[in-house]
Amino acid sequence: MEAITYTFILFLTLGLLFFAVAFRETPRIQKK
């Protein structure tokens, strides 16, 4: 059970980081 919990936390953190980078870089890409 511990492995599943750690994997879930890892994916959650990676997802949050990915969203943060996407939201920060999206305005720069759309701004032409």
UniProtKB/Swiss-Prot annotation:
It is a single-pass membrane protein. GO terms for cellular component: photosystem II reaction center; plasma membrane-derived thylakoid membrane. The keyword Thylakoid applies. It comes from the Bacteria. The chain crosses the membrane at residues 3-23. SUPFAM superfamilies: Photosystem II reaction center protein T, PsbT. Found at the monomer-monomer interface of the photosystem II (PS II) dimer, plays a role in assembly and dimerization of PSII. PSII is a light-driven water plastoquinone oxidoreductase, using light energy to abstract electrons from H(2)O, generating a proton gradient subsequently used for ATP formation. Belongs to the PsbT family. This is Photosystem II reaction center protein T. It comes from Synechococcus sp. (strain JA-3-3Ab) (Cyanobacteria bacterium Yellowstone A-Prime). The gene is psbT.
